């Protein structure tokens, strides 16, 4: 490990997420994938650990072709704590993603190594569930919101730096605890932007929603829009509404209407 990696004079990052990013299926994976590409481009050596320790194609091979070592398999799963301890002095930092994953690793890293930890929450779970509670009044959602609030603030307190994709989330965190080290970073999904586009948008037709339906708020948003808003639009404009996203439920699929 040391001879192979440190001889290159590059810093090594252990990047931990729930599984290898399925970058063509959901926004969180796309963001993760783009940041992995950026880290490699910036000269870091990246070791990627998916908490399910699965070899999933074509995604694992894509990372490996980028020069990222993916830690997977039953042998690695049984030795991950030993691996981290053995290589702690070779690693520059650990980048933990998502509260349900980060909470599995942060205590071991802080107690058994001197490594710096960056935590990226992807979204504030407690805020999302509290907003749903406000809509539904379901006390189970309030209980779940409080649970995630305790987890997320514990992680941010233990991490050396935390990131979220919006200033709204950062403001919410600082309203509760101004001392938390947290910043907003862009949900980075494109390598480059088109500066000049000759497309005549007046020729475009329809409305488009893009979002993975494994994320419940996306399904809620589409159902609400179709039932409450789209009929009002159709009274004035005969436009179509296109829904694009992975893992659509039967309820979402039932919205299909070619007419």
Give the ranges of each region predicted by the language model.
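Acceptor-binding helix/loop patch of EC 2.4 sugar-transfer enzymes
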Residues: 22, 115, 119-146, 171, ...
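Nucleotide-activated donor-dependent transferases that construct or modify glycoconjugates
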Residues: 8-25, 51-53, 75, 207-213
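N-terminal strand-loop element at the rim of the active site
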Residues: 41-71, 75-78
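Non-catalytic membrane-proximal stalk/linker segments that position and tether the catalytic domains
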Residues: 1-29, 35-38, 59-66, 193
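Conserved catalytic-core segment of nucleotide-activated headgroup transferases in glycan assembly
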Residues: 24, 28-38, 48, 136, ...
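Short N-terminal targeting/anchoring amphipathic segment
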Residues: 84-103, 118
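Short amphipathic alpha-helix with an adjacent loop that forms part of the alpha/beta core around
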Residues: 79-88, 196-199
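Short internal beta-strands
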Residues: 45-52, 119-121, 242-244
């Amino acid at each position: 490990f040391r001879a192979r990696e440190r001889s290159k004079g590059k810093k090594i990052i252990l990047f931990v997420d729930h599984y290898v990013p399925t970058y063509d299926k959901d926004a969180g994976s796309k963001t993760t994938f783009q940041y992995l590409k950026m880290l490699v481009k910036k000269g870091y050596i990246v070791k990627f650990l998916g908490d399910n320790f699965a070899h999933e194609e074509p995604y694992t091979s894509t990372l490996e072709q980028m020069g990222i070592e993916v830690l997977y398999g039953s042998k690695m799963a049984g030795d991950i704590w030993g691996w981290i301890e053995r290589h702690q002095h070779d690693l520059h930092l650990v980048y933990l993603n998502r509260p349900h994953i980060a909470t599995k690793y942060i205590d071991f890293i802080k107690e058994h190594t001197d490594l710096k930890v960056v935590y990226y929450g992807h979204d504030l779970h407690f805020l999302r569930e509290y907003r749903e509670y406000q809509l539904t009044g379901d006390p189970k959602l309030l209980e779940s919101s409080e649970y995630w609030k305790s987890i997320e603030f514990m992680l941010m307190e233990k991490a050396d730096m935390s990131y979220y994709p919006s200033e709204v989330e950062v403001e919410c965190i600082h309203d509760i605890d101004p001392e938390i080290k947290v910043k907003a970073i862009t949900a980075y999904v494109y390598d480059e932007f088109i500066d000049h586009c000759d497309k005549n948008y007046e020729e475009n037709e329809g409305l488009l929603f893009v979002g993975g339906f494994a994320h419940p708020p996306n399904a809620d948003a589409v159902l609400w829009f179709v039932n409450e808003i789209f009929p009002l639009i159709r009274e004035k404009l005969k436009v179509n509404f296109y829904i694009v996203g992975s893992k659509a439920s039967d309820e979402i699929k039932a919205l299909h209407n070619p007419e």
